[in-house]
Amino acid sequence: MSPLKPLYKLYEWYISRNLRRDRMPRHVAIIMDGNRRYSKLQGSMNPIEGHKKGIETLEKVLDWCVDLGIEIVTAYAFSTENFKRPEKEVKGLMKLFRENFEAIASNEKIHKNRVRVRAVGKLELLPEDVRRAIEIAEKSTEQYSDRLVNIAIGYDGRQEIVDATRKIAEDVKAGLIDPEDIDEDMINRNLYTAGLEDPHLIIRTSGEERLSGFLLWQSSYSELYFCDSLWPELRKVDFLRAIRSYQQRERRFGV
């Protein structure tokens, strides 16, 4: 055990004790960056090992969110750009996605905490077996409303806006709506995330300071927090620091 671990535990307790429950972000979105770099640092040439560790980290983060009363989590798992990665890595990722979505139906913790699971993105780009697994996961949790976990997979924020405007244009062409009726609410209703509250806080790991196409429309007034830790190495103290930073900010919403 690291000699610093007891100190971090004490620090975790201190931060958690001073967080205000009435100022907790309701929706936290996460860019889970750094899995591949983690694999290399561990001496593995197989990036899938880093992605497996990343899934374990996501499970821990979801537990922390339950403890803190955070109701909505959106995790950026796989972008449309990621399809350009080596074929072996993409196939390995799809296998991981399929296995983990399939496991949701029998996950006791998911059902105990009444967590609804949803996938958002251009899902038609995914292999059929992954889409079936997503359908199983969504169907097995659709009755829950206490908490919501969105997995952004096959997702790109620009493409999301393009697809939304294309659907609206088709409705205009069909005479279902007038161009004058188009407003922000209509665009919101046609996004992959339709019906989802905008994120209050977006966290990105690995030290990169950009959104990389994540929730571009929805993040106008989101607070951003960048963490140096690689995603598989994220500690609870890192997550608590992000929440503390959010609570220390004054949200102006453009005013």
UniProtKB/Swiss-Prot annotation:
CDD domains (alphabetical): Cis_IPPS
Keyword Metal-binding attributed: yes
Active site residues according to the UniProt entry: D33, N82 (proton acceptor)
EC number: 2.5.1.89
Pfam families referenced in this protein's UniProt entry, alphabetically: Prenyltransf
Any one Gene Ontology molecular-function term assigned to this protein's record: magnesium ion binding
SUPFAM superfamilies, A to Z: Undecaprenyl diphosphate synthase
Stated family: Belongs to the UPP synthase family.
Protein name: Tritrans,polycis-undecaprenyl-diphosphate synthase (geranylgeranyl-diphosphate specific)
Gene: uppS
